[in-house]
Amino acid sequence: MSGPRGGSYGKRRAAVRVFAGSVLWHHAVLGGMGGAALTASELTPGAPPAASARAAAQETGTDLYQRVVRYRLQRSTAAAQAVRRQTITQSQYDKQRLDSLVRLSIAAGDIAWNADGVKFRITPKASVAFPSFYNLTTHFGMTVTQPNGAAGGGGGGGGGGDWQKTLDAGAGIDLYSSVRRSHVFAVNTKYEALRDAQEALACEPHVSEKQVLEDMRRMLDSYVQLLHAQESFAQKQNAERSVQVAGYTDRSIVYRAAALERERAQDALKVAQDAFDGEYRDFIISAGQEFLEKRADQERFLLALAESVPEMPLVSTEHCEADTSRPLRNAREAADNEREERAVQNFPVALRLDTRFTLDEGTGELSVAFPSVKITSALAIGYTGTLKSIGGSLDWHPFEIRYAHLRGKNQRLHDALGAREYAQKKEQQEKVIADLPQRAEDILWERETARAERDTYAESARAHRKGLDRGVIGARGYAAVHLDYVRAVINLAKANVDALIFNIDARVDFLSSGTQT
């Protein structure tokens, strides 16, 4: 989509204009007003607090937010871990794919001399297996033996002897079994793990930036709470003084009630200060910035940081659907993998054909295995066409059929449970996807409202500054307007933070996304 622009959004924009106009009209009598932006002449060390945000921005650079993000990324342990996980999963995938494709074994066998004589024996052998090709296996081995006295016709061995040779070769293949299926499943599982690791590595910068944004939002929220607590304490303190001026003694109920309210506000202020100090300290350490002791310096930094948060357009949600949802895809694959693993483990039948060749005869063996029963038949035929032997075997495990029945029952129950869990996850994710357009509209509304408030209170602060210079208003009135301006700047930063988090979630949680125009 190109962005929410419905009727409700248009009404909200009209409401923002009405709000801004009413505030500007209210403060217009205090002095002339220019544009929304504060002028460069106000950006001085003695400038009013309303100008401190842009003054600090000039002092620290307009790329303060980007520098904070870069610092966090450069020192992120999660990025290094993502690289290691990608390397590990790549190695595991390559190993599993090669192991499922071919297995080769070559050995020299035994080389021995008899201590009693000059007896020599060598037994080379080799085998090749193709697990993914119906578990096809081939092997070849031979033994060459020199009896005592075969070399040189003497040597104290007494009597000559001929070289003795034996041959052992064969091949086998699964006509019906779970071996090939199990190897295909193993390769697919390793591939999915590799793909997830690669995606995690690609998304790591976005994830780290989101962590910065969330930390920043908590810090800004705690500062807004501190401002509210300071304002509340000042009001309660003024109320207590008003009661004193009215003539109430410290023993009167009215005074004691006012004092109690002031003490409660003071306690709340202490809690808010401690909360903000903790959030500020943690963020400064993680961002690699200078720790500022004075509250005024902290405010300049916070406003500069708030002003440096980029105002980005929201990404399009037209690709944010169930088919492109990464969490839903992972949940579906996890359910499918669990079901496939149980199916491989409980495969009911195995049918295999093996052949073996020696210098004298060839042997064929056919085996079939069911739960509790394994039947094997073997046939040996000489190279002259004569039947040398025929045989078979029967293995019976009477309780295995019961075990197989229980495994099958558990498999069906697990499959039903897995399907139900996946259906619940799909329902939850579809709800999240359905709420995305409304979430985007709310973010745009909050950002436009916050922007209008910021511009309005900037004009109001300029007007109050002129009134303060002319002596029309006092410092307390100007401080109240400054407080409104600080809140407006922080609210706009929080709206921009929400927009950035929305974009990151869309890029990380969905396989593709576009940019809003």
UniProtKB/Swiss-Prot annotation:
Belongs to the TP096X family. This is Uncharacterized protein TP_0967.
